Amino acid sequence: MSKRYLDDVLSPDTGTSDSDSSIENLNADNYRIDIVNDNARRDDIDRIQSSNLNHEPPYNLEGVFAIDDDEHGDEMVRKDSDRRQDITEDNDDSFVPDITTPPRERKRVRFGINEKGGDEEFNNVSPWDFKRLIRKFYKEQLPDTYQIRNWKRPSKDMLTNFIDLIENNIELASEEVFKQYHQELNQLYPDSEEQAKLKDSLENKVFDTTYNIKKRLKRTKVPSKIWVDNLNMEYIYAKGESIKKRYKSELDRAEAIERQLIREEEHLKSLQEKGETQAKKRKQVLSKELSELSKTMHPSLSVALSNTFGLIKDDKMSNEIYQQDKIDFNLKLKTDFSKPLISEKEENSLNGLTNAMDNNRELVNEIFGKISALLQPKKNSNE
């Protein structure tokens, strides 16, 4: 059977079928990728440029490789056969044009594309939307030259400290409120237990709100890095002028303080000089008065008087009289005043003797009083 099929294929009298004639009449150049007609090329370029304007991929692959589903398999076979012929055939007259790629759209740098309008975003902010509230407050308080670059979650220590400050004041605040409205509470809730329950319920509600605040604060972000725009010439000039003015004011203030210190030093020196001159004058006046008094007074009194006025120093206090008496009367002091003169036993014995003498004196006084009392009535009876 296989031999019969080979004979039919190799025989020259076999007729061509309709399918073979249709394939021969087709122009393979119309289905080649490397040879493109001018009109089709313009249509493809216009289609690609319009797609680029709508921010789609730079190449419209579906437009370039648009093939019907029914003819997809046959055309792929023809294209493969055409490529093989181009590779095998060496024809100098055949011209294959270069593949032209459509021009790409240049990348454009767009700043703040993901940022919303500042005023419109923060016009109506919910009080529980902490994320937007924090951004709004930072935007209002920071100057225009400051820009926040990075945002991060708040730390646990920051959150715990903030919540502790609120929770520690809840009980104190509730007590102050109940004290302030004590009369109204007594009218509405005369029972103390009901007031206590009301207080507990209010405190629990406040604690619940603080818990919700903590949960929402965990989701917020705070700025971690700020960039200062120092390239604004007006800002740099204004900042330089303010620094100059402040530096000048500080210099003037320092000079004023120095001048004040110099004046105070001069005043102190003048006071010291006045004090020294007054002391010298006072000493001269006192010495003159003492010299006049010493003429009419005893020499020992004049020395004592001069000592009372402080004109004689302690080093110059003389004991000439004592030394003279010591020589005249042969005085010798053997006692050591650094040690106690009497021992404890002697002191105790002396104390006992003094007590006994005091007791004896009291007895003598009592006896004398009794005797005098007995003698007085006898005198009256004799009379």
Curated annotation (Swiss-Prot):
Low complexity bias locations: 11-22
Residue span of region Interaction with AME1: 234-264
One GO-annotated biological process of the protein: meiotic cell cycle
Region spans: Interaction with NKP1-NKP2: 350-383
Subcellular location: Nucleus; Chromosome, Centromere, Kinetochore
Coiled-coil stretches noted in the UniProt entry, renumbered to this chain: 244-274
Sequence segments annotated as region (Disordered): 1-24, 77-102
Protein origin, superkingdom: Eukaryota
Gene Ontology annotations for the cellular component aspect, listed alphabetically: kinetochore; nucleus
Residue stretches of biased makeup (Basic and acidic residues): 77-87
Region (CTF19-MCM21 binding motif): 318-337
Disulfide-linked positions: none
Keywords on record: Cell cycle, Cell division, Centromere, Chromosome, Coiled coil, Kinetochore, Meiosis, Mitosis, Nucleus
Family as reported in the entry's similarity comment: Belongs to the CENP-Q/OKP1 family.
Record note on quaternary structure: Component of the heterotetrameric kinetochore subcomplex COMA, which consists of AME1, CTF19, MCM21 and OKP1. The COMA subcomplex is part of a larger constitutive centromere-associated network (CCAN) (also known as central kinetochore CTF19 complex in yeast). COMA binds the centromeric nucleosome-binding protein MIF2, and to the outer kinetochore MIND subcomplex. OKP1 interacts directly with AME1, with an NKP1-NKP2 dimer, and with CTF19-MCM21.
Role noted for this protein: Component of the kinetochore, a multiprotein complex that assembles on centromeric DNA and attaches chromosomes to spindle microtubules, mediating chromosome segregation and sister chromatid segregation during meiosis and mitosis. Component of the inner kinetochore COMA subcomplex, which connects centromere-associated proteins and the outer kinetochore. COMA interacts with other inner kinetochore proteins to form the inner kinetochore constitutive centromere-associated network (CCAN), which serves as a structural platform for outer kinetochore assembly.
Protein name: Inner kinetochore subunit OKP1
Source organism of the structure: Kluyveromyces lactis (strain ATCC 8585 / CBS 2359 / DSM 70799 / NBRC 1267 / NRRL Y-1140 / WM37)
Gene: OKP1
